[in-house]
Amino acid sequence: MAAPESLRPRLCRLVRGEQGYGFHLHGEKGRRGQFIRRVEPGSPAEAAALRAGDRLVEVNGVNVEGETHHQVVQRIKAVEGQTQLLVVDKETDEELCRRQLTCTEEMAHRGLPPAHNPWEPKPDWACSGSLGSDTGQKDVNGPPRELRPRLCHLRRGPQGYGFNLHSDKSRPGQYIRSVDPGSPASHSGLRAQDRLIEVNGQNVEGLRHAEVVARIKAQEDEARLLVVDPETDEHFKRLRVVPTEEHVEGPLPSPVTNGTSPAQLNGGSVCSSRSDLPGSEKDNEDGSTWKRDPFQESGLHLSPTAAEAKEKARATRVNKRAPQMDWNRKREIFSNF
């Protein structure tokens, strides 16, 4: 086994030959990413030091860890006659996972940073061989990883922040499409596939793409972005809690159990999106709430009078009527189609 200080990603530059590049790419069930399955002897891939078992991290400077096999193949074919691949072998991949570092092109030149180095990003993706759980991501070689949002502080460089933001028609929200290697975004811990929750302390989940971009540009030379990776996003959605800066280092919401209201989850706020919440019997669709019975709150359960029973029956019939649609919401729904 190689010493940790000698481990580093490899940047392989391939020039296409008459028979192609000479390597085979495939995905592995249960593991995230694309892997080099075979390298042909005497091929450009072998000359570039590409090896079977390597995991592909970047293609021509773009992180592809969250992309499908087809998308990765198209990126390799996009530049005719040559390609540049950032890869990690199994040992390096495990070391990066153990230290919760994200692989970058800079590491191929400088090696892995010392453990005390301040530019190490905060924990992000779990290792590719990890198993999910309700409260965190359980790594086969270590303790469970807490699923938390990440607060990324970016200072604008000469080339900007170094990330690309996009919206996806198939799902609401704004997503990080790519992060430039060695950029302020990369050093802040921002990653491709992250979903943007807040910009400079303001929730932007309901804003349009142009509005989010304007918020990022509002402060000229810096931005503070609260983001969640796909696993953390799913976890918080299951709990029906909107991630906030408090969840970065503070108490995390607990899984919902019988008799527990989502609003009681360790101070977490309930997700405002109606599509994420099942109907509640205690809340009317028009936003009003049931009046509390002071006797019941004190522990006394009294039988209703005839008048009370009649009033309750009338209220139940009223509440079964279909709610009036908010016209702003209606336009939103239509625009999504």
Swiss-Prot record:
Localization terms from the record: Endomembrane system; Nucleus; Apical cell membrane
Domain PDZ: 11-91, 151-231
Keyword match Iron-sulfur: no
UniProtKB keywords: Cell membrane, Membrane, Nucleus, Phosphoprotein, Repeat
UniProt feature, compositional bias: Polar residues: 255-275
GO MF annotation list: molecular adaptor activity; phosphatase binding
Membrane topology: Peripheral membrane protein
Disordered as annotated region, ranges: 112-145, 242-337
Name of the protein: Na(+)/H(+) exchange regulatory cofactor NHE-RF2
Organism the protein comes from: Mus musculus (Mouse)
